[in-house]
Amino acid sequence: EIQQNENLFSDSKTFVDAIPENSLDSIKREYEKIKNKGDSAMFKFLRDNFQLPGEETSQGYQTDSSDIATHIKKLWSVLKRPADEKLSGTLIPLPYSYIVPGGRFREIYYWDSYFTMLGLQVDGEVETIQHMIDNFSYLINKFGFIPNGNRTYYLSRSQPPFYSLMIDVLAEEKGNTVYAKYLPELEKEYQFWMEGVKNLSERDSVLNRVVRMPDGSILNRYYDNKNTPRPESYREDIKTAEEAVNHN
């Protein structure tokens, strides 16, 4: 919180994606020594104690003048990440390779990946589709749902549930046995989205990710378990909240 308010980075996501290189106790001790010594001391502290992220690029890759389909096909190798090593920091390691959006987005994202898979399907990248679905299945089995992305700061929220549509894509390539293979994970995710539905009533019509409409029908909604600023957009959320208060 202190660091995010210092405005040392133009992007709030930079610090929360940094990897600690020393123990928490050591970092705390070093911070206490320099916390009132200005920006240059703070930057040195960050460089000495954290591996700071940069925008991921692929050496030697340049946008060319080929047609859009060829350009996209070339991008798969640029945006593909191998299975993760177990590191400290906020990244949740995934057991299989996956595609990232790129730039400041260095991790897999839930519903984005469905549209990525549609492109992968066109280019015959079925194994990559399989690996990404297996990563999402891993997250369902580990956490009971698919987070916004594979970062610990995303564990309080999900994104629109496209997992079943991803299974449809894979089934188109590998046949209907795919549905049986992933049925346990499909059911677990459904239970996550429907949690609390039996406790809804006309008086208490909203709970977690379920909403009871006046006619008795049930809808799902976007919901975050936390009501605090998002770590990856901390400064922006604080500003939005302040502006909302001032406006009212």
Regions inferred by a protein language model and the residue ranges of each:
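Acidic, mature catalytic/reactive cores of soluble proteins
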Residues: 1-248
